[in-house]
Amino acid sequence: MLKIVANTADLIGDTPLVRLNRLQPENAAQVYLKLEFFNPSGSVKDRAAYQMIIEAEQNGLLKPGSVIIEPTSGNTGIGLAMNAAARGYKAILVMPDTMTKERINLLKAYGAEVVLTPGEERMPGSIKKAKELAEQIPNSYIPMQFDNTANPDAHRKTTAPEIARAIEEIGKPLGAFVASSGTGGTITGTGEALKELFPDITVHVVEPAGSPVLSGGKPGAHKLVGTSPGFIPPILNEDVYDEIIKISDEDAYTTTRRLAAEEGILVGPSSGAACFAAIETAKRLSPDKVVVCMTADTGERYLSTDLWSFI
């Protein structure tokens, strides 16, 4: 059916689920990937960005002429830049200088100003700089995705109900939900709501083996962009997940490449990591169950990285 909408915000959500075929393990639960690159700016973060802006407007924190400032690893910033452009706000996004060229250029394409901070400072450095800018710029507002309850709320309101409707259509019980974690918004909001709807499911959070902060380890370098900011975000509900799955850069990269070459699904490395974890989770469940895995963004944002250096 042809979809005609009033603005880009109406295109956020209702992303499709696609079944794994060639990567599907035998005698295991069926894995479905929820393709968040179908959102208008290409990632799951469109959901949180829109919800944070709407709630800020409702609470009088954003008014005509306001400036949105946000520390971001990229996807939330892109979602905020898109929504800011559509709603008439200026956006300033602060990010580590290790982020991909594609992300930086996308932000600029949406009319946003980009401020880069030293990569070795990771997200805490970008957060500090964003707060400094907010003190200097009048009528500015930091949504602060790591603290903002609108972030998980977006997934309670949209992502989880979408998955529930899909499970009803598939006709098999949901056995597990798998997602990576950056801010914690997706795993918290979706996980909480799905456990209310499907009390018997397990929730599995993915983090990079090189920066196992959720597992109690120290932050470190890794290639799963958008995950493990180097600290445990305040909005993350650590009780919602039943298992933390640590994924190596190598396994994430291999799975990401296989998804493109064998399934025709081009996603980013954090999605490859989540898919690897979903496949391993599915092997522990019976074939009459379903595993839903969130894929955070499009792989087009990573074509300049070593993920695709062999091309």
From Swiss-Prot:
Keyword Thylakoid annotated: no
Keyword Transferase: yes
CDD domains in the record: CBS_like
GO BP annotations, alphabetical order: cysteine biosynthetic process from serine
Cofactor(s) for this UniProt protein: pyridoxal 5'-phosphate
Molecular functions (GO terms): cysteine synthase activity; L-cysteine desulfhydrase activity
Catalytic activity: O-acetyl-L-serine + hydrogen sulfide = L-cysteine + acetate
Metabolic or biological pathway: Amino-acid biosynthesis; L-cysteine biosynthesis; L-cysteine from L-serine: step 2/2
Superkingdom of origin organism: Bacteria
Annotated NCBIfam families: cysK, cysKM
Protein name: Probable cysteine synthase
